[in-house]
């Protein structure tokens, strides 16, 4: 959501995208998680949109034993890979929703939508790499 707002889908340029998100949620085809909501900065245009438009169920809770268990498995896997220490620390940082998003999708049999692509690089843990490792489907906004 944050990258979409900054790049291709600015509110002033493409308001239909944001209406589409709400329609997809209403149809039961789209959710996000509480950790993503928590990353959105107060005073930001996206913050205002979330709190004025997104229903409370739009952001699923990651506070379940099943999600925490999957997240833990992902942290163990990431730490066992050849990623740089900085990449591992960034992925595990309390403010980073990426691992939680994949864990939530795994537990709930959902598809992760991301602008990231698979990468052999070791400087950043990419969502598609974690999805592949844990059997979670992913796509980008154009799929």
Residue ranges and their predicted role:
Residues 1-53:
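Short, well-structured N-terminal submotif of metal-dependent ribonuclease cores
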Residues 37-92:
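PIN-domain endoribonuclease scaffold, especially VapC-family toxins
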Residues 78-84, 106-116:
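Catalytic-site beta-strand/loop segments enriched in glycine and acidic/polar residues
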Residues 38-39, 93-97, 117-123:
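Acidic, metal-coordinating catalytic cores used for nucleic-acid/nucleotide bond scission
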Residues 118-143:
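Acidic, PIN/NYN-like endoribonuclease modules and their adjacent C-terminal/linker elements
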Residues 92-112, 126, 130:
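Acidic, metal-associated active-site segment
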């Amino acid at each position: 959501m944050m990258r979409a707002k900054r790049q291709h889908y600015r509110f002033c340029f493409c308001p239909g995208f944001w209406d589409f998100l709400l329609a997809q949620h209403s149809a039961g085809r789209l959710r996000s998680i509480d950790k993503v909501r928590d990353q959105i900065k107060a005073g930001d245009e996206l913050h205002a949109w979330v709190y004025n438009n997104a229903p409370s169920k739009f952001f699923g809770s990651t506070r379940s034993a099943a999600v925490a268990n999957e997240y833990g498995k992902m942290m163990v896997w990431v730490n066992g890979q050849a990623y740089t220490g900085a990449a591992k620390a960034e992925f595990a940082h309390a403010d980073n929703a990426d691992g939680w998003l994949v864990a939530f999708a795994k537990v709930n049999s959902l598809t992760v939508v991301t602008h990231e692509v698979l990468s052999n690089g070791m400087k950043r843990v990419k969502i598609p790499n974690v999805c592949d490792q844990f059997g979670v489907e992913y796509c980008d906004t154009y799929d």
